[in-house]
């Protein structure tokens, strides 16, 4: 089968691969739409997870069931399905402990374009299909369905990590597609003030449409000074991080008030260490909590988030700026995510 792969760090291209084999608990999916992600960029061009050779990229997509294993009862050939980017082994010890995303070890639920081939192919494999697939609601837009793989659940998970509650004031760093979904999630949870920190004026109106109340351009002013000024020098109760370099954590701690929480879903793709400012962290005793996590994936989460779209409580289409028609446009869509032109938020390829 034809597939688009990471050839090695810094290089991608089209290759031929065998069709994946379906085990008794698995499913083989023919993609209907896929979406490149900034994580693919970190993996290929920053070497974020180390060297990979001829590994098929892609962890965001939806499709139609082409084959199911003998133990799969809830899905049949021809079903249109949603697929999460994170596909845990749901009978694992870590899943039973409440951390399915780490089944089999740290980040073990992240399989696509990490430890196995991803979705940018004519067919892709899904393990533990009963737990990792969900039926696509009738009439759902395919591009919206792709956003359920990663952008929506990851953005919403930032809110869970920071324990967003009614009326809180929070700051949000990096309003890319995951960030916009984090903003939407915070608004749905009832956050009272949502301060967006980014450098792209074009994104402000979209961020406001999802619930942002204030905007800071970090290229024009000091983020720390501005947030402290706006909060009477107290800082915000919560900080959500979905992007940025290794220093962004330092800024987050500086603007967080004592007792506050940071919810990080950012993939730090480069550097060996992340630094914490000693004084602003209360020399270790400020009760400023840093909570970073990988979203959990799974059928139940997919079904719940799909319900928000179908009842029009969430509209991910606002952030899809580039739509391509045809499998052959995967490379073009990926390089858009790498080059980040000013008008880009998210690209999607519909087959």
Curated annotation (Swiss-Prot):
Its EC number is 1.1.1.80. It is an enzyme of class 1 (oxidoreductase). Binds 1 zinc ion per subunit. Keywords: Metal-binding, NADP, Oxidoreductase, Zinc. Its cofactor is Zn(2+). Signal peptide: none annotated. It catalyses: propan-2-ol + NADP(+) = acetone + NADPH + H(+). NADP(+) binds at residues 175-178, 198-200, 265-267, 340. Zn(2+) binds at residues 37, 59-60, 150. One of its GO terms (molecular function) is zinc ion binding. PROSITE patterns: ADH_ZINC (PS00059). Gene3D superfamilies: Medium-chain alcohol dehydrogenases, catalytic domain, NAD(P)-binding Rossmann-like Domain. Transmembrane segments: none annotated. The keyword Nucleotide-binding does not apply. Alcohol dehydrogenase with a preference for medium chain secondary alcohols, such as 2-butanol and isopropanol. Has very low activity with primary alcohols, such as ethanol. Under physiological conditions, the enzyme reduces aldehydes and 2-ketones to produce secondary alcohols. Is also active with acetaldehyde and propionaldehyde. Belongs to the zinc-containing alcohol dehydrogenase family. This is Probable NADP-dependent isopropanol dehydrogenase. The gene is adh.
């Amino acid at each position: 089968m034809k597939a688009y792969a990471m050839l090695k760090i810094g290089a991608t291209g089209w290759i031929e691969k065998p069709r994946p084999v379906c085990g008794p608990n698995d499913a083989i999916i023919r993609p209907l739409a896929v979406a490149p992600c900034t994580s693919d960029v970190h993996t290929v061009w920053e070497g974020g997870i180390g060297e990979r050779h001829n590994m098929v990229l892609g962890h965001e997509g939806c499709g139609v069931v082409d084959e199911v294993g003998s133990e799969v009862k809830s899905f049949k050939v021809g079903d249109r399905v949603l697929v999460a980017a994170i596909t845990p082994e749901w009978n694992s010890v870590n899943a039973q402990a409440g951390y399915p995303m780490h089944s089999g070890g740290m980040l073990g639920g992240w399989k696509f374009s990490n430890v196995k081939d991803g979705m940018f192919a004519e067919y892709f494999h899904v393990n533990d299909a009963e737990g990792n697939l969900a039926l696509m609601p009738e009439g759902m837009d395919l591009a919206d369905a792709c956003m359920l793989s990663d952008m929506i659940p990851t953005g919403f998970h930032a809110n869970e990590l920071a324990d967003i509650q009614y009326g809180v004031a929070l700051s949000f760093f990096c309003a890319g597609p995951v960030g916009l979904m984090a903003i939407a999630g915070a608004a749905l949870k009832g956050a009272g003030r949502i301060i967006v920190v980014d450098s792209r004026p074009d994104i402000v109106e979209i961020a406001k449409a999802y619930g942002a109340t204030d905007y800071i351009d970090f290229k024009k002013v000091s983020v720390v000074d501005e947030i402290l000024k706006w909060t009477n020098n107290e800082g915000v109760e919560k900080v959500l991080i979905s992007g940025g370099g290794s220093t962004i954590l330092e800024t987050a701690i500086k603007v967080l008030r004592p007792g506050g929480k940071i919810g990080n879903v950012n993939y730090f793709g480069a550097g060996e260490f992340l630094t914490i400012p000693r004084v602003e962290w209360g020399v270790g005793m400020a009760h400023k909590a840093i909570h970073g996590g990988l979203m959990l994936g799974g059928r139940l989460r997919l079904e719940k988030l799909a319900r928000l779209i179908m009842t029009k409580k969430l509209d991910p289409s606002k952030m899809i700026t580039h739509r391509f028609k045809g499998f052959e446009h995967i490379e073009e869509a990926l390089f858009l995510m790498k080059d980040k032109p000013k008008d880009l938020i998210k690209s999607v390829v519909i087959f």
